């Protein structure tokens, strides 16, 4: 049991390091651009920062959604221990993505965000996805699970429309080559399709078990 706990701690440490590596690299490159005027972030550093943080937010969201199917396929219940962590990191990257847009793109004129939301559909869906993530991040603790009881599960089903909105945000943002957003859309469709199939299978199994036995002839 102790060995298993050590393994989980080691795995969580590795996940923390892997997930924080992209933002650490981005921070270092931003510092180089800011202090030395280097081209570490390409010709458009602001666009590069927004792209990378948004992409990692989407990736981590999809990885979070993949935890349940992976647990069901492998039988490894320990995978559930990583779901909350990955979901919070998805929110973290989404928040950095939004902050970069407000601070670097709008240059602090944050009131413009409301004009942008009205004018640009991809910003509308992206901002909506972030807003929906906020209550999920706040209520991700054990304390909130106890307070909300069954409503906790209902609330956290928002992760599904959030995934759809995030993919749509990326799809509308890309102007020409849609191969990358199409790939993420396909992954999301697979993850949601798996859940639908499992739910329908469970209903059929329940219906078979609850059906009355056939009448025996007299």
From Swiss-Prot:
The chain crosses the membrane at residues 14-34, 60-80, 86-106, 121-141, 155-175. It is found in: Cell inner membrane. Its cofactor is FMN; heme b. GO terms for biological process: protein repair. One of its GO terms (molecular function) is metal ion binding. One of its GO terms (cellular component) is plasma membrane. The keyword Transmembrane helix applies. The keyword Amino-acid biosynthesis does not apply. Keywords: Cell inner membrane, Cell membrane, Electron transport, Flavoprotein, FMN, Heme, Iron, Membrane, Metal-binding, Transmembrane, Transmembrane helix, Transport. InterPro entries: Fe3_Rdtase_TM_dom, MsrQ-like. Binds 1 FMN per subunit. Its main location: membrane. It comes from the Bacteria. It is a multi-pass membrane protein. NCBIfam families: PRK05419.2-2. Belongs to the MsrQ family. Heterodimer of a catalytic subunit (MsrP) and a heme-binding subunit (MsrQ). Part of the MsrPQ system that repairs oxidized periplasmic proteins containing methionine sulfoxide residues (Met-O), using respiratory chain electrons. Thus protects these proteins from oxidative-stress damage caused by reactive species of oxygen and chlorine generated by the host defense mechanisms. MsrPQ is essential for the maintenance of envelope integrity under bleach stress, rescuing a wide series of structurally unrelated periplasmic proteins from methionine oxidation. This is Protein-methionine-sulfoxide reductase heme-binding subunit MsrQ. The lineage of its organism: Bacteria, Pseudomonadati, Pseudomonadota, Gammaproteobacteria, Lysobacterales.
């Amino acid at each position: 049991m102790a060995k298993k706990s050590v393994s989980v701690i080691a795995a969580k440490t590795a996940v923390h390091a892997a997930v924080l590596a992209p933002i650490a690299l981005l921070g270092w490159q931003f510092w180089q651009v800011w202090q030395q005027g280097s081209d570490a972030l390409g010709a458009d550093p602001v666009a590069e920062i927004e792209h990378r943080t948004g992409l990692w937010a989407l990736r981590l969201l999809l990885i979070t959604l993949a935890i349940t199917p992976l647990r069901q396929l492998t039988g490894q219940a320990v995978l559930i221990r990583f779901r909350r962590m990955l979901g919070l990191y998805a929110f973290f990257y989404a928040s950095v993505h939004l902050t970069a847009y407000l601070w670097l793109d709008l240059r602090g004129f944050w009131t413009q965000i409301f004009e942008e939301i009205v004018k640009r559909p991809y910003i509308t869906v992206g901002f909506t996805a972030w807003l929906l993530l906020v209550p999920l991040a706040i209520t991700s603790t054990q304390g909130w699970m106890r307070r909300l009881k069954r409503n906790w599960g209902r609330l956290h089903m928002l992760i599904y429309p959030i995934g759809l909105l995030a993919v749509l945000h990326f799809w509308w943002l890309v102007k020409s080559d849609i191969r990358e957003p199409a790939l993420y859309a396909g992954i999301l469709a697979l993850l949601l399709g798996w859940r639908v199939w499992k739910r329908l299978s469970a209903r059929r199994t329940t219906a078979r078990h609850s059906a009355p036995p056939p009448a025996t002839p007299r």
